[in-house]
């Protein structure tokens, strides 16, 4: 499909789901600087291949916001697509949030994939929408619904980093985290950034180009450590070593249902700038 055809298909799905405005970030599910091919929804829907930018799709317009590094490239790649270029930082050019505030009205609905927008930004948008009498829908990956030949999620083999190179065992690192949790009065700790998880568990992978990380989430409580990842990427010996250190492997995408099981009075440590919106749903007390 051409970019125009993709946008038309997206608009049809938006209409079916009664979503008036759809936001498409560049982000993956982990706030990574570089993203794998599976996550390049903004590239797919606009044709713009730069590393930074956001798209907003409505029934009567489509826009791309990007910074000064990409003005020339974006203008060339968007030509003939019907996607309008918004040059970030230029005079009289609204930010994405300013644009949404202007366009959204009573009874309208803003949608985005809640796995790709941070909890912090989702809170800001929720507040903005409340003032406008609009609603938010974050359960659907609409671009994924029309992307027929979408690349698969990466599942590169995981390796274990020997403690002589890591400098500290994962057991000792996890003990230090739990001590910090106790000092802060936290019952749980949710970690979503891939480099932090790789460091904490002394594992390395190849799921992001030029970055030795493993697609995963980690949840730690006072008694459990749960790693949400594709078990097929782990050898039997690494799975056994992780198990001996108290780490249980669960399916990668089951994190979203798991966080909903948190007790309402459970206090959870997480970074709302990095953790995505859907990783915080069901969590009332966040530090």
Q: Where in the sequence are the language-model features?
A:
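Acidic, proline/serine/threonine- and glycine-rich low-complexity intrinsically disordered segments
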Residues: 280-285
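N-terminal accessory/capping or targeting/presequence segment of soluble
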Residues: 2-105, 117, 121-262
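Acidic beta-strand-to-loop metal/phosphate-binding motif
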Residues: 108-115, 267-273
């Amino acid at each position: 499909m051409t970019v125009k055809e993709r946008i038309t298909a997206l608009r049809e799905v938006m209409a079916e789901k009664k979503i008036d405005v759809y936001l498409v970030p560049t982000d993956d599910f982990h706030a990574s600087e570089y993203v794998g091919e599976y996550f390049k929804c903004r590239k797919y829907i606009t044709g713009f291949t730069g590393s930074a930018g956001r798209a907003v799709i409505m029934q009567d317009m489509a826009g791309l916001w990007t910074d000064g590094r990409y003005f020339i490239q974006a203008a060339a790649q968007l030509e003939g697509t019907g996607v309008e270029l918004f040059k970030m930082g230029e005079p009289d050019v609204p930010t994405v949030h300013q644009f949404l505030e202007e366009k959204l009205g009573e009874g309208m609905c803003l949608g985005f994939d809640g796995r790709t927008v941070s909890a912090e930004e989702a809170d800001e948008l929720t507040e903005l929408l409340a003032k406008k009498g609009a609603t938010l829908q974050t359960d659907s990956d609409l671009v994924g619904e029309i992307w027929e030949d979408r690349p698969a999620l990466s599942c590169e083999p995981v390796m274990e980093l020997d403690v002589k190179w890591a400098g500290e065992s994962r057991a000792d690192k996890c003990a230090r985290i739990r001590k910090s949790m106790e000092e802060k009065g936290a019952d749980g700790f949710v970690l979503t950034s891939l480099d932090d998880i790789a460091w904490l568990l002394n594992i390395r992978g190849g799921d992001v180009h030029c970055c030795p990380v493993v697609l995963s989430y980690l949840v730690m409580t006072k008694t459990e450590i749960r790693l949400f990842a594709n078990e097929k990427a782990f050898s039997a010996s690494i799975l056994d070593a992780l198990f001996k250190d108290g780490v249980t492997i669960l399916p990668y995408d089951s994190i979203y249902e798991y966080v909903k099981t948190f007790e309402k009075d459970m206090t959870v440590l997480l970074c709302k700038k990095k953790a995505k919106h859907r990783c915080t749903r069901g969590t009332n007390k966040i530090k």
